Amino acid sequence: MTRVSDILTFLETIAPQDLAMDWDNSGFQLGDRNAPVTRVLVSLDPFEDTAREAAEWGAELILTHHPLFFDPIKSITEETAVGRTARLLIQKGISLWSGHTNLDVA
């Protein structure tokens, strides 16, 4: 069975983390590296609607270009889109990987 870690290893061969700009937050954002994966949703941005669609579709992993966590995190609450998205991903057991500047450079 394919696991999140298997896909992350493959992605690292395409877009190595060391290619990311220093200010960027590319890479594994959230989730369980050991979780099994049968469906992957690909999106430009990790919006709340994206997380909801992944949950409805039964995806265990989302791959995005832009990261969910970009600015320093001060809190994760229902009052922000990032907080609501993170909560939904955690509740549904969905992992998130973002390939931003490392993917741009690759």
Predicted regions mapped to residue ranges:
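Hydrophobic structural segments
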Residues: 1-106
